[in-house]
Every structure is written in C-alpha cells, then in structure tokens.
Amino acid sequence: MADAGARRPFFRRRKTCPFTGANAPKIDYKDSKLLMRYVSERGKIVPSRITAVSAKKQRELARAVKRARFLGLLPYVIR
C-alpha cells in the first residue's frame, strides 16, 4: 500500500471555450459588454490561456476588440 502521507495529485479540470456550443454567444464588435469581459482592467486583451478561449475564437475576439476600439466603442487604454 502507498505511504499514508502520499496524496493523489490535484487535477484541474480543463475549461471549455465559452464561444463553442449550442447557445454560445456570437463574437460581435458592437457587443461592447461581451468584449469588456475579455479585456483587462488596463484595457489589454486577456490571453486565451486565462480565458480558455480556443485559438480560432481568440483571433476573432482580438479582431472584434480592435475594430470596436477603432470605432470608439471600447477605449484603447483604461486609466
């Protein structure tokens, strides 16, 4: 039998992409409320390893954030 002090390693469950699935929201540059969830408090786009967004959807998200910034819907920098 194993040591009494030995424990099973903790396995973190892999998060799934919030933009894939049946009722997933569409990435739209006009939806600033949705986009703000993926922008940090300083105004930077949060990386996919933190938000668990797939690579394809992360590219779409970055494109939507940049387009919203250009049109004045999102700020470039939050102070």
Swiss-Prot record:
It comes from the Bacteria. GO terms for cellular component: cytosolic small ribosomal subunit. GO terms for molecular function: small ribosomal subunit rRNA binding; structural constituent of ribosome. One of its GO terms (biological process) is translation. Keywords: Ribonucleoprotein, Ribosomal protein, RNA-binding, rRNA-binding. InterPro entries: Ribosomal_bS18, Ribosomal_bS18_CS, Ribosomal_bS18_sf. Pfam families: Ribosomal_S18. Binds as a heterodimer with protein bS6 to the central domain of the 16S rRNA, where it helps stabilize the platform of the 30S subunit. HAMAP family: Ribosomal_bS18 (MF_00270). NCBIfam families: S18. Part of the 30S ribosomal subunit. Forms a tight heterodimer with protein bS6. PANTHER family: 30S RIBOSOMAL PROTEIN S18, SMALL RIBOSOMAL SUBUNIT PROTEIN BS18M. Belongs to the bacterial ribosomal protein bS18 family. This is Small ribosomal subunit protein bS18. The gene is rpsR.
